[in-house]
């Protein structure tokens, strides 16, 4: 029983983000479709060869996507919304881009599909749309073409296909409502056809991804798996693939399926290997997801070996990444600025392939010397002073319940704040950022590259802040912001100023489409060596008599949008960040800043996949926010901003944050989101976003007034604020001025009654 290794997928974008550049060039009309397709072919060939050279036995094919793999599956099945269809019924790459972006070099523009998070990762997928009576047919043969490509290059391949039940689970019904699960029998013939085509090509194994099997699914969805896989059996061997959680709760459903193997995530799941071995059919292959596909840490391979060695020789076994390596940067070797000690702790996608080769060889031979050598740096890390800060650990251990409580309840604080700020009814503000112009980005880049000295950089930033204050005063806004000209990214900026974080040069991961992010890495205990935002907030406040908000990114969001440590809990990291930012709140307050906003857009995103695990997460997530904010005096007003499409199921936790003001994204839902706050009888102040900043369209005064009147039917007017949905970083100044002028006018009209 020779053990093989494989990956579940590989990053698509290219080491230098070649795919992003090719996509954006094509969209802008600066290159041809053939030039774009050529970049895709080149990247796929390179990535297969790199994995092979790193020691991978079975190469994934079908993991490449021009925008998103769920969208690729939609096209494969012929699921193209009517508004995006070509007149002749054909499907091409521009069809795909129109669904993803709303427009493409050919075809008519139309509303893009909805985009949402891929399970609990920071990757996004395009939500499939289903209509009653929908027809499906094999339409987009990208998978088959890529299999042919890989076979022609002489590779041993394992095609990757998103499974039918998960695909339906991820979608939404449009128009007349019906049960989307009823479409299962309509899509299965397409899957059968694809598997038959793969069998014709001599394919032995197909990785069929069903990550929905780690969720707490309704019984009807669990029951759908058996008939679905009965229909798919017999043409090739199927590796039923799950990830992001364990499968034990749904193992009875899984073991009844006519598949030949199961992949489990042994990093994020709590499945016991011995128990899995006992319960799986003896002729099934077990693919053990031992190497973390969604973090950047070098694995302790001696631990991984011990985790799996007892079943070696007892069943067919593969070793694999826990999930697709899509969520990891590509290659650590090109990082030239990382400290040597810190660099020795990391493994990016190619290094993870090497780990799988080492693990496979040791399991086949019984010789673990290479595993011990590889694991030495990560074992040494446990005692590094770069990791452990006794002062932080002592402070964290000393936290009491009092540290997460404001001195008085909201009603008392609100009186003190009204007396201090004397704001009018319907107070107007913005969410924080103003347009990041070419001048601002060039200024920051020149400073970063060393082409600009610190004095000239600070003079430039000060000028942009001054301009933002002047603009806001001219517009008549009531509570101002400094505009965040000095900030590149709301998480990266804070990470750069906190001890315990490091940054990469090329650690890009795909977020969606052509958007890539370079998350900070938490390597050790987090602390704040010096004030971060105080200087610029104080400067902005000196330019005006109106209150200027201090702007912080909250602890849970910084955690969720970074690569976290693996040696301590997420709760520990969040609370360390909260303590560091608590000191920032105190310093802002001491500098005369009376309104402080702590953004937590990721609080809901961080929810565990299983609802039964939500309470524990929300408890420490809320506590981290409160630790951050509770140092504020009664007359300091704490704001928070959140952009979710669903609040109902976490309203208790939103209220428990005890922010004085919460601003939320509501314009696209026509204020429907406020229902949650009305039904809950939310006690504090709310700023429902009155226009969508993601669109360049300028809302009319009448439209904003109508939205605010609608809001006032749900929330008492004396507790309502007036603000856009989100920060204005991505907008231009002309539409920003026009939209804010109309927003201020609408508020003034309502004050006059």
Curated annotation (Swiss-Prot):
Which parts of the sequence bind 5-methyltetrahydropteroyltri-L-glutamate?
17-20, 117, 515-516, 561, 605
User: Pfam families, alphabetically?
Assistant: Meth_synt_1, Meth_synt_2
Pathway linked to the protein: Amino-acid biosynthesis; L-methionine biosynthesis via de novo pathway; L-methionine from L-homocysteine (MetE route): step 1/1
List the active site. Answer: 694 (proton donor)
Any one GO MF annotation of this record: 5-methyltetrahydropteroyltriglutamate-homocysteine S-methyltransferase activity
Checking InterPro entries in the record gives: Cbl-indep_Met_Synth_N, Cobalamin-indep_Met_synthase, Met_Synth_C/arc, UROD/MetE-like_sf
Q: Which residues bind L-methionine?
A: 431-433, 484, 599
Q: Binding residues for L-homocysteine, per the UniProt record?
A: 431-433, 484, 599
Give, as one word, the top-level EC class: transferase
Q: Which UniProt keywords apply?
A: Amino-acid biosynthesis, Metal-binding, Methionine biosynthesis, Methyltransferase, Repeat, Transferase, Zinc
Q: Determine the domain of life of the protein's source.
A: Bacteria
An example Gene Ontology biological process: methionine biosynthetic process
Answer yes or no on keyword Methyltransferase: yes
Enzyme Commission no: 2.1.1.14
Instruction: Kindly list the positions annotated as binding Zn(2+).
Output: 641, 643, 665, 726
Reactions catalysed: 5-methyltetrahydropteroyltri-L-glutamate + L-homocysteine = tetrahydropteroyltri-L-glutamate + L-methionine
Cofactor(s) needed by this chain: Zn(2+)
The cofactor remark states: Binds 1 zinc ion per subunit.
What's this protein's family per the entry? Answer: Belongs to the vitamin-B12 independent methionine synthase family.
The free-text function statement in the UniProt record for this protein reads: Catalyzes the transfer of a methyl group from 5-methyltetrahydrofolate to homocysteine resulting in methionine formation.
NCBIfam families from the xrefs? met_syn_B12ind, PRK05222.1
What name goes with this protein? 5-methyltetrahydropteroyltriglutamate--homocysteine methyltransferase
Source organism per entry reads Escherichia coli (strain SMS-3-5 / SECEC)
Q: Which gene encodes it?
A: metE
């Amino acid at each position: 029983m020779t053990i093989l290794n494989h990956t579940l997928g590989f990053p698509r974008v290219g080491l230098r983000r070649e795919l992003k550049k090719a996509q954006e060039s094509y969209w802008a009309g600066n290159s041809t479709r053939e030039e774009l397709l050529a970049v895709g072919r080149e990247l796929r060939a390179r990535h297969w060869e790199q994995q092979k050279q790193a020691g991978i036995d079975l190469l994934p094919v079908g993991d490449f996507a021009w925008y998103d793999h769920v969208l690729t599956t939609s096209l494969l099945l012929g699921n193209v919304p009517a508004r995006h269809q070509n007149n002749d019924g054909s499907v091409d790459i521009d069809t795909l881009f129109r669904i993803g972006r709303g427009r493409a070099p050919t075809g008519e523009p139309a509303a893009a599909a909805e985009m949402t998070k891929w399970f609990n990762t920071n990757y996004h997928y395009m939500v499939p749309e289903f209509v009653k009576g929908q027809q499906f047919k094999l339409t987009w043969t990208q998978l088959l073409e890529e299999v042919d490509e890989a076979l022609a290059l002489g590779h041993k391949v394992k095609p990757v296909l998103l499974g039918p039940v998960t695909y339906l689970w991820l979608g939404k019904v449009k128009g007349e409502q019906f049960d989307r699960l009823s479409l299962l029998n309509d899509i299965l013939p397409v899957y059968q056809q694809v598997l038959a085509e793969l069998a014709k090509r001599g394919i032995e194994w197909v990785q069929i991804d069903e990550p929905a099997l780690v969720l707490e699914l309704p019984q009807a969805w669990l029951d759908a798996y058996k008939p679905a896989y009965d229909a798919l059996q017999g043409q090739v061997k199927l590796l039923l693939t799950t990830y992001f959680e364990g499968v034990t709760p749904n193992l009875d459903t899984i073991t009844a399926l006519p598949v030949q193997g199961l992949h489990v995530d042994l990093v994020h799941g709590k499945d016991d290997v011995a128990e899995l071995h006992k319960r799986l059919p003896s002729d099934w292959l077990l693919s053990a997801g031992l190497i973390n596909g969604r973090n950047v840490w070098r694995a302790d391979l001696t631990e991984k070996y011990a985790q799996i060695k007892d079943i070696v020789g007892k069943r067919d076994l593969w070793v694999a990444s826990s999930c697709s390596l899509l969520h990891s940067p590509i290659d650590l070797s090109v990082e030239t600025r990382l400290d040597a000690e810190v660099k020795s702790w990391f493994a990016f996608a190619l290094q993870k392939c090497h780990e799988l080769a080492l693990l496979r060889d040791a399991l086949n031979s019984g010789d673990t010397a290479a595993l011990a050598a590889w694991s030495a740096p990560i074992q040494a890390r446990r005692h590094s002073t770069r990791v452990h800060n006794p002062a932080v650990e002592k402070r964290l251990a000393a936290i009491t319940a009092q540290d997460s409580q404001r001195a008085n309840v909201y009603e008392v604080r609100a009186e003190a704040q009204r007396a201090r700020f004397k704001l009018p009814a319907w107070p107007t503000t913005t969410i924080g950022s103003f347009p990041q112009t070419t001048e601002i980005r060039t200024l920051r880049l020149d400073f970063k590259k060393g082409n600009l000295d610190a004095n000239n950089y600070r003079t430039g930033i000060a000028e942009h802040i001054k301009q933002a204050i002047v603009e806001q005063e001219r517009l008549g806004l009531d509570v101002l912001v400094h505009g965040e000209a000095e900030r590149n990214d709301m998480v990266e900026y804070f990470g750069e100023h906190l001890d315990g974080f490091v940054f990469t040069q090329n650690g890009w991961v795909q977020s969606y489409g052509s958007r890539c992010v370079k998350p900070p890495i938490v390597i050790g205990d987090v602390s704040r060596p010096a004030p971060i935002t105080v200087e610029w907030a104080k400067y902005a406040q000196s330019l005006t008599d109106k209150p200027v908000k201090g702007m912080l990114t909250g602890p849970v969001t910084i955690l969720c949008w970074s690569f976290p440590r693996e040696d301590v809990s997420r709760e520990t990291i969040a609370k360390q960040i909260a303590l560091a930012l608590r000191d920032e709140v105190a310093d802002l307050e001491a500098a005369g800043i009376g309104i402080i906003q702590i953004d937590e857009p990721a609080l809901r995103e961080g929810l565990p996949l299983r609802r039964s695990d939500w309470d524990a997460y929300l408890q420490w997530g809320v506590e981290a926010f409160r630790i951050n904010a509770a140092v504020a005096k009664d007359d300091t007003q704490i704001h928070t901003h959140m952009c979710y499409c669903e609040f109902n199921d976490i309203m208790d936790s939103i209220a428990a944050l005890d922010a004085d003001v919460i601003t939320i994204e509501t314009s696209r839902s026509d204020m429907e989101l406020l229902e949650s706050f009305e039904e809950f009888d939310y006690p504090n102040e709310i700023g429902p976003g009155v226009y969508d900043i993601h669109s360049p369209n300028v809302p009319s005064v009448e439209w904003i007034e109508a939205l605010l009147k609608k809001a006032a039917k749900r929330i008492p007017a004396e507790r309502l604020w007036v603000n856009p949905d989100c920060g204005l970083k991505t907008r231009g100044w002309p539409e920003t001025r026009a939209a804010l002028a109309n927003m201020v006018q609408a508020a003034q009209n309502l004050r006059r009654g």
